[in-house]
Amino acid sequence: MLRCSLGLVKHGLTGMTTSTPPTAPAAKRLTPPTVAARAHQIIGWLHQRRDRLRAHGVQQYFKHEVVSLGIATPALRAFAVAQSKPLTAAWGLREATALCDRLLQEPELEVRGMGILILGAFRRRFRPALARAGRRWLETRLDNWALVDSFCGSVLSPLLEQHPGVEKTLRRWSGARCLWVRRAAIVTLVPFARHGQLLETVYELAGEHFADPEDLMHKAVGWVLREAGKTDPRRLRAYLCRHGPAIPRTTLRYAIERFPGSERRQLLECTRPSARGAPRGGASRRA
């Protein structure tokens, strides 16, 4: 993914860096902080480190206007670790979810991203019911690809790893009217596809979005197909040839990035629509 100052997108199930910023406020261990107090502290710390020039540069990665503080990625991640360590000792999942909910109410990318990263530190305590809060956030507060992809990597993918039944939830989400819910259904599967897991689901859901009107869905589908091809390129090749002209060209180009140049050209040619207006497959929005 593109590297902007937000730096929140996680392409797997690994944890965050363990370095700690020297200026981060000390966390108290004896008395568990209230959600409101910790949210106030986090918001204040982040706003104090606003970099207007860097924030202006973040905008180039988004088609619509976003609000950014322009905080450098290392400082942002290190502060997330500094906050998460004592909170995982003092809090349960309920408090962590409440903190995330509170921070997601703020307009800045970094503040909302911090809520996601801290909630992700509680991954070992995740319960399937967290998916309900996740859908609500996707429909109301996670409104760009960077935050959605970060939420998938930090929260939804670990949730699916611990509770395989969440796969059924993702199948329902795949047909949602909300773009961000649909994207989350696909991006959550990326780390699994990379390791050759849940490939039946990956290929099935990918096919539902060939007719999706959103370019961000075409890119997400291409991404997950590319990852699926890392462990079984023959299966990906057969899938692409079978669906041929129905596949959006953006999806196809993303999916074949790992193939040799000559094979990429061959796949682009053999999947090219034979005539303008060739029908595209896909399912209609359901929920």
Protein language model annotation of sequence segments:
Residues H11:
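Cationic, low-complexity basic patches in intrinsically disordered or flexible, solvent-exposed regions
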Residues T17-A287:
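Alpha-helical scaffold domains
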